[in-house]
Amino acid sequence: KQKILNTKDSVSKIANKIDRLGLGAPIASFLIRIAAVESCYGLNRRAGNNIWQVDPIAFKDTQNLSSHPGLKSKFKILKDNGIDWPKLTYTQIKSKPLLNAIAARLYIGNMPGDIPKDLKGQANYWKSNYNTSSGGGSTYEFIKKNSGDGTSGCIDYV
């Protein structure tokens, strides 16, 4: 259990760093919850370093200025922080947790509506917008993995 909490702490630091970049409203708690359900904070070896399970289509969406002109100002913020987002490849963002978190944040920023603050609301938002019907997760799983200290359901990966 301690290993899970240590890993969750690392994910929390990354999520809070993403908030400090200023790519949109602060959503660190939602990013942490996504990491819990998508990869058990990266402990699920099948996820590799793709902690937020950003797929190639979602990644392309984070670089698509035609569909999402609001990305332009976010690219400038990233460039000012030494990250030339339009030049990155999927392989790069999949293998580096910070870039993976940025991809998740940009992808979420392209979605409609505000992110709910409560766990059930976030579970529904995640399933409707992030995991979608083609993803294998459920709102029940999102809630279960994010209840209590956030270690439920991750014990199998330690």
Model feature map: region roles:
Residues 1-16, 22, 33-112:
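Peptidoglycan-targeting cell-wall enzymes and recognition modules
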Residues 25-33, 118-126:
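Alpha-helical scaffolds flanking conserved acidic
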Residues 39-46, 114, 131-140:
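Secretory-pathway/luminal and periplasmic proteins that interact with or process carbohydrate-rich
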Residues 111-119:
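Inter-helical turn/loop segments and adjacent helix faces that build the functional surface
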Residues 123-158:
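Long, amphipathic alpha-helical surface segments
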